[in-house]
Curated annotation (Swiss-Prot):
The chain crosses the membrane at residues 91-117, 170-195. One of its GO terms (cellular component) is monoatomic ion channel complex. It is found in: Membrane; Cell membrane. It is a multi-pass membrane protein. Belongs to the inward rectifier-type potassium channel (TC 1.A.2.1) family. KCNJ15 subfamily. One of its GO terms (biological process) is regulation of monoatomic ion transmembrane transport. The gene is Kcnj15. One of its GO terms (molecular function) is potassium channel activity. This is ATP-sensitive inward rectifier potassium channel 15.
Length: 405
């Protein structure tokens, strides 16, 4: 039996109840897999079966995009113009193409207007049969349309041969040279931004896949928070480093409330914590020991906590040597206690390693269930003591604030 958690239809704990009870012991435990539905919508949960309780908004989406809005910054447009290169590169393609097309058309038109003004001042627009000996500044430019076409042909180096500049007007020659220099610089800038945007390692980072959920299980006798990461391309990533930041509200001893307090969460692979070889989908572990910022998690309070775990993978692209970063985040509703990931890597009949990504998002109950189903009274007592200690700290902070006033 496979239970699928569909966003908005039922809560995750209800879906997990479809798995057989663990009280029968590890020997009779049936290894059932759960497929985690992908969704970027804010998660909600039932509060004592009455209504829905919304959780704190994400700082970072599952795809790694920041949800923080920058507002009320003095001179923000000037700051963007001062860093024009980054501003143009960060533009979306539709805005970039529109801006560059408008830039070319405007330069053609503006220089065409100046050419038309030169021809008007020189009297080239009033030529007739009686003025056949008059030499114009620009041949065949007797209207604004002709001036625009001359500007376009000169800037794009088309050179049809009908319209050409003469030696009669030195200022027209100077304007032609200025146009070619200015537009060449514009073309260099445009070409550079296009190449820089295409070659950005951002697209390479999108081929790094994180598991949609995280699990808490025992690894080598230690309680660990586990996530999966996979490289979707054959080209390798070198010098990989995975780290995490725990974001949660924190109240200092002075009573100051920090909305997004950051705590470092260290991950490791097997016995190594630096530069894992990410050639196959790998499992990263964070040990929930006394030094862990997640040490207070229990099966009872996991879904009641309000925090966000941001995971960052920094790596160097083998083919371009560019540094890329892939990000994701996990909230309590996406962390499952007492589960483990279904193995993804297997050995084929031909002796080759095969990564089956249809199993990448699936989890199953851990066979070692003693760490979360035994001694529940002790866990409840520890949780009660922890809540009393938290209330005592909040009371001391409140008294300290009143004394300062």
């Amino acid at each position: 039996m496979v239970a699928r958690w569909v966003k908005g239809s039922e809560d995750a704990p209800l879906a997990l109840q479809k798995i057989p009870d663990l009280q029968s012991g590890p020997r009779s435990l049936r290894m059932e897999a759960i497929h985690i539905g992908m969704s970027s919508a804010p998660l909600v949960k039932h509060s004592n079966g009455v209504g829905l309780k919304a959780h704190r908004p994400r700082v970072m989406s599952k795809s790694g995009h920041s949800n923080v809005r920058i507002d009320k910054v003095d001179g923000i447009y000037l700051l963007y113009l001062q860093d024009l290169w980054t501003t143009v590169i960060d533009m979306k393609w539709r805005y970039k193409l529109t801006l560059f097309a408008a830039t070319f058309v405007m330069t053609w038109f503006l220089f065409g207007v100046v050419y038309y003004a030169i021809a008007f001042i020189h009297g080239d627009l009033e030529l007739g049969e009686s003025n056949s000996n008059h030499t114009p500044c620009i041949m065949k430019v007797d209207s604004l349309t002709g001036a625009f076409l001359f500007s376009l042909e000169s800037q794009t180096t088309i050179g049809y041969g009908v319209r050409s500049i003469t030696e009669e007007c030195p200022h027209a020659i100077f304007l032609l040279v200025a146009q070619l220099v200015i537009t060449t610089l514009i073309e260099i800038f445009i070409t550079g931004t296009f190449l820089a945007k295409i070659a950005r390692p951002k697209k390479r980072a999108e081929t790094i896949k994180f598991s949609h959920c995280a699990v808490i299980s025992k690894q080598n006798g230690k309680l660990c928070l586990v996530i999966q990461v996979a490289n979707m391309r054959k080209s390798l990533l070198i010098q990989c480093q995975l780290s995490g930041k725990l974001l949660q509200t924190h109240v200092t001893k002075e009573g100051e409330r920090i909305l997004l307090n950051q705590a470092t969460v260290k991950f490791h692979v097997d016995s190594s914590s630096e530069s894992p070889f990410l050639i196959l989908p790998m499992t990263f572990y964070h040990v929930l020991d006394e030094t862990s910022p997640l040490r207070d998690l229990t099966p009872q309070n996991l879904k009641e906590k309000e925090f966000e775990l941001v995971v960052l993978l920094n790596a160097t692209v083998e083919s371009t040597s560019a540094v890329c970063q892939s990000r994701t985040s996990y909230i309590p509703e996406e962390i499952y206690w007492g589960f483990e990931f279904v193995p993804v890597v297997s050995l084929s009949k031909n002796g080759k390693y095969v990564a089956d990504f249809s199993q990448f998002e699936q989890i199953r109950k851990s066979p070692d269930c003693t760490f979360y189903c035994a001694d529940s009274e002790k866990q409840k007592l520890e949780e009660q003591y922890r809540q009393e200690d938290q209330r005592e700290r909040e009371l001391r902070s409140l008294l300290l604030q009143q004394s300062n006033v």
